[in-house]
Amino acid sequence: MTKIPMQPADSTPATFHPNAPTKTNILGMNQEQLGAYFKHIGEKPFRATQVMKWIYQHGVTDFAQMTNLSKGLREKLSEQACIELPEVMHKEFSEDGTRKWVFKVAGGSLVETVLIPADDSKVNGRKTLCISSQVGCALDCSFCSTGKQGFERDLTAAEIIGQLWVANASYMEGVDSTEWQNNVTNVVMMGMGEPLLNYTPVVSSMGLMLSDHAYGLSKRRVTLSTSGVVPKMYELYKDIDVALAISLHAPNDELRNELVPINKKYPLSELIAAAKAYVHDNNPRHKKHVTIEYVMLAGVNDSDEHAQQLVALLDGLPSKINLIPFNPFPHAPYDRSSNNRIHAFSNILNNAGFVCTIRQTRGDDIDAACGQLVGQVADRTRRSAKWQQSIKQRAANEQQSEG
């Protein structure tokens, strides 16, 4: 059974507050939390599963429409509770079928979510949702635009699971059907933020994704991507059974310290050990490998020697390698590796016995590709101002050095 940690008492708005003057947002509560809420308001805890099915399997956010609840309970919930979704500020559609939403969350901050269909011509084909876990990111990876925006705050479980709810709802717009359909088939925690630095809300949200009373996704269809928060990796496989991806991007500590600064705290030896533990100590039926993500930066990490170092580093770790062509952003200090270089790098890995794929860039025309999520639309946050100031300072320094 999946173990879902309870959210801390101050994790608003997805947590029940008995003395709060406003309505309690029950979106994002897991079965245990929602059962406790119903018990507090004088109702049977089993009502939790009924309400969860209405919210996540039928797309209902109006208590009055939850017809298997008594009229009295529906009225009580309408008075005391709410199902508050993140506000859609903007949405864009790419020519390749990719969709991007910009959400406004509590406090006015903006986060982005991306849905990538495997083939937009197939109504029932694979649709992968890339979900954000934080407003901005504190890790400051040098090749990622999100990190350059700085960190503002963690998202709540309601704000995380709400992204999935809205994505499913968007597919129902204009559909001639009286039945709700959950069209998202895969979820990847690869959007804005480092998921393991927002541990409890992220794990609780993934629990809803897996729960038979909510979305009921397969464990193999929910993936968490981490840059390497090693202590939390050891906790993760004890708390929930999902697929793991590692944002590696370099085959040695010297280079990874530059590209992924968290490596200075948790070096590659510790990261790979944690990944091996995740594979071998967890249920082997569901954890046959981890996915290794590796962005291809021209002249930085894409040489034959780097590929050979990567082969040695991953020895003994069941893994699949996903090479990601770099997606440029304004003032990025890197260029994308050439297609020939990427394929040569891939061939070395394949010849060494690894399964290596090259990610197809999707959604780059709407700034929805990997590494491009920054909440650009109507972004007036402190993060944006800080980034703009750094650009001006860099330009001033360059002019000064030229002079």
Swiss-Prot record:
Keyword list, A-Z: 4Fe-4S, Cytoplasm, Disulfide bond, Iron, Iron-sulfur, Metal-binding, Methyltransferase, rRNA processing, S-adenosyl-L-methionine, Transferase, tRNA processing
Uppermost EC category: transferase
EC code(s) of this entry: 2.1.1.192
HAMAP family associated with the record: RNA_methyltr_RlmN (MF_01849)
Official protein name in the record: Dual-specificity RNA methyltransferase RlmN
Primary residence: cytoplasm
Main function: Specifically methylates position 2 of adenine 2503 in 23S rRNA and position 2 of adenine 37 in tRNAs. m2A2503 modification seems to play a crucial role in the proofreading step occurring at the peptidyl transferase center and thus would serve to optimize ribosomal fidelity.
Reactions catalysed: adenosine(2503) in 23S rRNA + 2 reduced [2Fe-2S]-[ferredoxin] + 2 S-adenosyl-L-methionine = 2-methyladenosine(2503) in 23S rRNA + 5'-deoxyadenosine + L-methionine + 2 oxidized [2Fe-2S]-[ferredoxin] + S-adenosyl-L-homocysteine; adenosine(37) in tRNA + 2 reduced [2Fe-2S]-[ferredoxin] + 2 S-adenosyl-L-methionine = 2-methyladenosine(37) in tRNA + 5'-deoxyadenosine + L-methionine + 2 oxidized [2Fe-2S]-[ferredoxin] + S-adenosyl-L-homocysteine
Disordered as annotated region, ranges: 1-25
Taxonomic path: Bacteria, Pseudomonadati, Pseudomonadota, Gammaproteobacteria, Moraxellales
Miscellaneous remark of the record: Reaction proceeds by a ping-pong mechanism involving intermediate methylation of a conserved cysteine residue.
Keyword Ubl conjugation carried by entry: no
A biological-process GO annotation: tRNA methylation
Source domain of life: Bacteria
Catalytic residues identified in the record: E112, C370
One protein family per Pfam: Radical_SAM
UniProt cofactor note: Binds 1 [4Fe-4S] cluster. The cluster is coordinated with 3 cysteines and an exchangeable S-adenosyl-L-methionine.
Family, as annotated: Belongs to the radical SAM superfamily. RlmN family.
Binding site for S-adenosyl-L-methionine: G193, E194, S225, S247, L248, H249, N327
Domain (Radical SAM core): residue spans on this chain: 123-364
Disulfide bonds: C130-C370
Species annotation: Psychrobacter sp. (strain PRwf-1)
Gene Ontology cellular-component annotations: cytoplasm
